[in-house]
Amino acid sequence: MKKLLLSLSLAFFGFYTGCNAAPSLVYYGDTLEWNTEWKRKQCGTLDINENIIEVSGIACSRVTPGYIWMQSDEKEKYIIATTEKGDKRACKVNFTKTIRWDWEDMSGGVYNDTNYLFIGAFGDNEETDGEYSIVYFQEPAIDPENTPEISITPNRIKYVYPDGKNHNNEALMYDNIDQVIYIITKVYYDVCQVFSIPFRLDYGDETQTLTYVCDLGVRSDLGEHAQNKPYKGFHLVTAADISPDGKYILIKNHNNIVATYSWILLFTRGEGESVAETLQRERHPEPLRCYNYEWQGEAICWLDDYTFYTTSDADDGNPPIYKYTKPYPEAVEQTAADPHSAAAKVLSNGTLLIRNGINLYTIDGRKVE
């Protein structure tokens, strides 16, 4: 009966949230175990009347936790902040000067104890533009009641590539450990390349030359028909992000011709490793199994080591916002150490909680203080 009751409760929780992924908790008689794989659920829907139609980059706010910054890829350049529900706009940031028109990705990071937002103004589909820059500015606080709209004068880092060529790009990420900005090219029938530049405040108007870091995947894996092997070459990269503590790297691609060729790759950084060493060591990481194709899915960002978000451009409606979670390791460790502890269920305010021994956890493995 005990097993049956908990199983029914877990089933109810899956129905309640609209999440059809496997539950994070599995109960076998007297043994409570965690399913440590990532799972996805829709946490919100982006109201395009309140927010942005063409979302090409997102970043979780570090100054005002609980909000997500979203970057517009429309002709009018601005960013907005909303919650993971996406139903209301909390803040709009306008820019006092225009810097290029094709903005493709955004990221957040810390430099000299100050939070910055970075925007990649580097889209070049035809590879004929040659004008590329990284827009950056201090992240503003979000106060929807008093300052729903503000203006900022951004800075920029102008750059060229070390090979002297033009490149199309849609992915940018910032590493808090090395304080380096990474840019990933978007290509169709070849491997994508990673370039970098250390973040500094004193570049001024001088054009900088990026440093080549590495290829993503192995070029020899592509073969004659590269479009049939997008995984190993991992082309069409549209978004990337590094977790705040630098331990994990997400790289997302998007193939709107063959939906099953769209993935998210998760790279785990070893102790003392650089980003380059991690990407080259894990040449063929497994795609996250919980991910499903998103229409024009071009945005991804970390909240913490155990939570990240994706969303996409609007098609013929309001695009969903997806939240990806896995259990915190403390929950896994406690359960492993005490597999026969009493398990109890509590239904509180529509949220199912699991008590394992003394501590209380949500279904996602978050410890309730």
Language-model-detected regions and their locations in the chain:
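Bacterial Sec-dependent N-terminal signal peptides
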Residues: M1-T31, E369
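Short, ordered beta-strand-loop transition motifs
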Residues: L5, N112, V346-G350
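Intrinsically disordered/low-complexity terminal segments and short unstructured peptides
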Residues: Y16, E206-L210, R219, Q334, ...
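A short, polar/charged loop/turn motif at coil->beta-strand junctions and beta-hairpin connectors
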Residues: N20, E37-R40, T153, H340, ...
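Sequence/structural signature of beta-propeller domains
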Residues: A22-P329
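C-terminal outer-membrane/trafficking sorting elements
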Residues: E330-E369
